[in-house]
């Protein structure tokens, strides 16, 4: 919701526009990209694939995510908007790695 306020300037020909936005902006929902435990592919392959698919991950981050999935059954890869989340998950699947997305709460 926006409030627009118009005022006449000194010469009666200029206008000042004041716009106030609501405190709560519409935020797009975020989605979690999840990596599932993979008994088929090697840990090294999964780490490399994570870094190829999500380039902003460091090697240490990729290893930590892979180990989280290995030890707990699922690891959190990244939280982002829906479109990139779908892209990351599908890219991992195309490399034979089990992945899913779910809405972040």
From Swiss-Prot:
Disulfide bonds: none annotated. InterPro entries: ClpS (IPR022935), ClpS_core (IPR003769), Ribosomal_bL12_C/ClpS-like (IPR014719). Pfam families: ClpS. One of its GO terms (biological process) is proteolysis. Belongs to the ClpS family. Involved in the modulation of the specificity of the ClpAP-mediated ATP-dependent protein degradation. NCBIfam families: PRK00033.1-4. Binds to the N-terminal domain of the chaperone ClpA. This is ATP-dependent Clp protease adapter protein ClpS. It comes from Prochlorococcus marinus (strain MIT 9515).
């Amino acid at each position: 919701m926006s409030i627009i306020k118009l005022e006449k300037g000194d010469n009666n020909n200029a206008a000042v526009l004041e716009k106030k936005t609501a405190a709560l902006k519409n935020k797009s929902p975020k989605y979690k990209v999840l990596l599932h435990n993979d008994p088929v592919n090697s840990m090294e392959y999964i780490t490399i694939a994570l870094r190829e698919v999500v380039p902003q991950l460091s090697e240490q981050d990729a290893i930590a995510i892979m180990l989280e999935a290995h030890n707990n059954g699922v690891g959190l890869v990244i939280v982002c908007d829906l479109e990139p989340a779908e892209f990351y998950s599908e890219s991992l699947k195309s490399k034979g790695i089990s992945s899913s997305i779910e809405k972040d709460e």
